[in-house]
């Protein structure tokens, strides 16, 4: 029997060919693996079947965060190329970023439209604290997001090894994206078409939360013992409707791991907004959410550990082995799974 605290227990083999480089179109034709908790059965559907699979009494909660063009390409003062990936605002017009290439405190990085990045601090997790200026004037968050729309690139995950295209601007954004701030998509949301959403609204209570997905979502767990992992922090905010649903006895389907973490954060803290650092795993199981819709996640990631918190390690790995053998498409642009 596998040790639930050992990182190697969350590893699995994935052929490179199963990593989706672009989505299935139309969206609802993506495949959907369904796991029935009571019987431990695995069934195979498509996303267009989702509305008929959700338990009748369940409320459905979505994440309406909007992905920004968080990746910018420029040059160091020395002339060498550099790449900056925005992580999140820190307040006081400072931002957490990841920089590809070596930079030190005091470095100034140059980008299009006279945008400059000034490196102020180096963090232990590899991120940098910076501010952004245009024509010498420090940019606030709204101004920065506006400038990034002009010069930035869609922040495709590192395992999608190609340049972003115009298509990614719509592919990597959910149809209900509203509040700008994510630097990665809440990928379970990407499967929804307007028609699918209307079918669900006709049968279920729905609500929205906002959790701005940070670049830390791609950061692997590097500790041998998962309990030593330091979880990244992400800003969240719940609508009044979401708070009402979580505070009720109504069963909840969370669309994606970001919704799950937000639901569980509120169930514990009763704080309607703040920063979520919740690490759900077999030592810290959900206390409120009942059902989960999610994509297939990277080996040894906090996201696959979140899945185990619902159904256990052995069943999770059995599902993943089945998905590989059935040639499901993995990761952000891939297929999904429903735990009910």
Swiss-Prot record:
Biological role: Transfers and isomerizes the ribose moiety from AdoMet to the 7-aminomethyl group of 7-deazaguanine (preQ1-tRNA) to give epoxyqueuosine (oQ-tRNA).
EC numbers: 2.4.99.17
The entry's keywords: Cytoplasm, Queuosine biosynthesis, S-adenosyl-L-methionine, Transferase
Compartment(s) where it occurs, according to its Swiss-Prot or TrEMBL record: Cytoplasm
Protein name per Swiss-Prot or TrEMBL: S-adenosylmethionine:tRNA ribosyltransferase-isomerase
UniProt GO BP: queuosine biosynthetic process; tRNA wobble guanine modification
GO cellular component, one term: cytoplasm
Record InterPro entries: QueA, QueA_dom1, QueA_dom2, QueA_sf
EC category name: transferase
Family, per entry: Belongs to the QueA family.
Major localization listed first in the record, in broad terms: cytoplasm
GO MF annotations in UniProt: S-adenosylmethionine:tRNA ribosyltransferase-isomerase activity
Source organism of the structure: Campylobacter concisus (strain 13826)
Subunit note: Monomer.
Pfam families: Queuosine_synth
